Amino acid sequence: MNDYKNTLNLPKTQFSMRANLSQKEPKILKNWYDNNLYKLIRQKKEGKKIFFLHDGPPYANGNIHIGHAVNKILKDIIIKSKNMSGFDAPYIPSWDCHGLPIEQKVEEQMGLKSNNIITTIFQKKCRKYAEKQIKKQKKDFIRLGVIGDWENAHLTMDFKNEANIIKTLSKIIEKKYLYKESKPIHWCLKCYSSLSDAEIEHFDKESDSIFVAIKSKNNKILKEVLNLNISSEKDIYLPIWTTTPWTLPSSQAITVNPIFEYQIIETKKYNLILAKELVKNVMKILEINHWNILSSFKGKILEGKKFLHPFLENISLPVILGDHVNLDSGTGAVHTAPDHGPDDYIVSQKYKIKTMNLVDFKGNYINNIHPKLNGVNIFQANEIIINLLIKKDCLLHHNILKHSYPHCWRHKTPVIFRATEQWFINIDQKKLRYKTLEEIKKVSWIPKWGGSRIEEMIKKRPDWCVSRQRKWGVPMCLFLHKKTGKIHPENTLLIKKIIKKVELEGIEAWWKINLKEMLGETYNMYNQTFDILDVWFESGNTHTVIKYKNKKYSKNHADMFLEGSDQHRGWFMSSLIISMLVKNQSPYSEVLTHGFVVDKNGQKMSKSIGNTISPNEVVKTLGGDILRLWVASSNYSNDISISNEILKRSSDIYRRIRNTARFMLANINDFNPQKNTVLKENMVLLDRWAISQAKIVQEEIIEFYKKYNFHAIIKRLMYFCSIEMGSFYLDIIKDRQYTLKTNSQERRSCQTAIYYIINALVRWIAPILSFTADEIWNHLPGKHAQYVFTEEWFNKLFDLDKNDLFNREFWKNLIEMKNEINKFLETEIKNKNINNSLEACLILYVTPEVKKTLNILGEELKFIFLTSKVKIELYNTAPINSTKSKKISNFKIFLKKIKEKKCPRCWHYNIFIENNNDKICTRCILNTKGNGEKRFFI
């Protein structure tokens, strides 16, 4: 038997079937960085329109987690797709370097608290620690395939950046937005520092829930005011409800709502003043079934009336009025401690009630409050206070309530509101809040709800507390008058001098300042403040300093910010406020947010649960491209699920794309684009369709990239690779590619189409499957750029002429017909009427119009349906036992088993020449010894 293998153009390629990504990717990375790929991209894009995605700085502490990977990969996909779309899209990575977590790590390493270490020495240790963490994280980010200007990353601890943060603060001071005040702010008892809203997380907590009866100071006067004609000798009480009994020592008033209706309720033991709408609920909680209504009145009547503190002697609590009192729960009256609540503080200011500062920075009561409370920690005080209330016979009810409570984002411990003297930015000064809300409307928010979310946050947010009582951070650089506490009148000029020092020495310069040299003769009249700025102020200022890296990127604002959905109250907000303060405009045109990574059950990743997946482990086992594909396949606008099963599905998708590329590469192994490319007008019709289909897909994919709809790209790619190419085009062209003459125009036409398509395909996947795209690029024949990443979308694809007989509509109908025939043949094979489609002689019954069109294709029609013979007949001549199509009207199919012999070379059942020593069909003789088979259509 003759071996015809050597007469066939069988596919060959060194592009392996097995990806071995974990082994190949490090080598690819080395090549990128040995050749400074990022610089090559920038050189190629010089002069193009800038697209600047401003990198939100991750914190320089610990290993990267899966959320970091999602964030960096999404950014990298966008940057690469923008470069591919004709933009100059740089990527300058950022890091947030100051802050408490680094302080704590350094304290652990040194075995000392920062207070016991010389500040400048401690800061240098923190700087070294941050550098080490950045080096580690940078390596991991690069391993993900993220291309950027890693050697010139933006670090908040760079001396110039530290100086610029001080410069920004100086501008804010000049505009009179900064003020100092003692007011309640979130305070962490572990950090010993104030916290911003962005540093707060809410978790469930069990708290003591108590109803306390607060006795009227003068029953007689109160009865007169309320026109109460009753003989009852019972005292009148104004009950309050609280879940923070420890705040009662700081209580200075009781607030009621002026417009609510209140009633005096007589019970067996007390006369209670309650909001009318809450009476039934309170009685139910107190388990009181019988009561009488003695009087009704508006809350405003109670203003100024005095009640006695429930357990502190000789302290009266006046009734004040406040709109914040609601009917959601409680009694309609709120005990008011301006030290421990923003609403309490605001309402107290109207009545000139000042804070008392009874709780120190560790959460302990100061002395001289009550003998049983002196020096006691507030969280141990609840039991003591409840016992005091019981002894005073004013505890109406006590139970344990589970509710959402603010916690420190670092320590995961409950925080408190504590009145301390801090520096604030006035959000309402010069209509800043209003202007910011207006600016939000000009930004494109993706998803759209992001705009509504930050808008609500801006509406409700308090003034920004920007001061912190720590050491590793940018100092506020203020000189305060010892008597008045006012900022030095020449502080702006002084800050300019300090900025120059910080640019040379870093923040450490502030702690080295000689006051006499700096202030001259007035030095002994001023104190140097050592408060540092909130780290959110630092990261929120990063958009103002990118220009130092490259002046051409210093446009008015970034094109995009992209972070997790928690950053609406974090970096998005701090950046927005600072930009409004300094430039009176938003720092971004677009803001894109992604969800959090959760496990397959929707649970948040947690070490304690044991459901975490490390990006480094995924990269080591499956490769960076699988992780990138998982990110791109996910609908990132919601929470993103990950598990080994989900990653396996990503691997399956990857395999389909890789195998499609491999098949294409294998079939152009002998193709020289400079010599063998066939012009459009000379191409086989099917090849023209394939190129036009690729053009349509490219247009769709470009639009998906433009809209950041990456999972739609993967879905479209899969359909293109599996159906339009795999099940249709690439399956059909095998016969022409393998059996025709090597250098025939028909075969080179097919190779031209494949070459064009894979040139487009490699660009489509480059932003997502970057390592694989690079590998494909290096296996493409002909001359081309060194890297796909310097290129733009492939521009040699073309469309079909819509006026042509064989236009898109023709191919759409033909593919529908093929799909129906495929189902028919599958049934025939299943019923064992034939072994495979090449044993079939198909007779198709169609309308006269369709018959006329299909007959133009002649003998080539069989290659579309992968059969050895096809006949076209009129629909009305179809035999009774023919199969009617369910999808296509006026279309029937009939099958006859082929009578001809099978050709051992092409496997078609064909005509043979008698006494043919070659034992192959006439078509194969023509292709091996003759001038070759002619193809025009398929």
Curated annotation (Swiss-Prot):
Motif 'KMSKS' region in this chain: 604-608
Gene3D superfamilies tied to this protein: 1.10.730.20, HUPs
Source organism superkingdom: Bacteria
Motif ('HIGH' region): 58-68
Alphabetical UniProt keywords: Aminoacyl-tRNA synthetase, ATP-binding, Cytoplasm, Ligase, Metal-binding, Nucleotide-binding, Protein biosynthesis, Zinc
Keyword Ligase among record annotations: yes
Chief location of this protein within or outside the cell: cytoplasm
Reaction(s) the record says it catalyses: tRNA(Ile) + L-isoleucine + ATP = L-isoleucyl-tRNA(Ile) + AMP + diphosphate
Residues that coordinate or bind ATP: K607
GO molecular function: aminoacyl-tRNA deacylase activity; ATP binding; isoleucine-tRNA ligase activity; tRNA binding; zinc ion binding
EC code: 6.1.1.5
Keyword Ribonucleoprotein applies: no
GO cellular component, one term: cytosol
Stored NCBIfam families: ileS
Known role: Catalyzes the attachment of isoleucine to tRNA(Ile). As IleRS can inadvertently accommodate and process structurally similar amino acids such as valine, to avoid such errors it has two additional distinct tRNA(Ile)-dependent editing activities. One activity is designated as 'pretransfer' editing and involves the hydrolysis of activated Val-AMP. The other activity is designated 'posttransfer' editing and involves deacylation of mischarged Val-tRNA(Ile).
Family, similarity comment: Belongs to the class-I aminoacyl-tRNA synthetase family. IleS type 1 subfamily.
Protein name according to UniProt: Isoleucine--tRNA ligase
Originating species: Buchnera aphidicola subsp. Schizaphis graminum (strain Sg)
UniProt lineage: Bacteria, Pseudomonadati, Pseudomonadota, Gammaproteobacteria, Enterobacterales
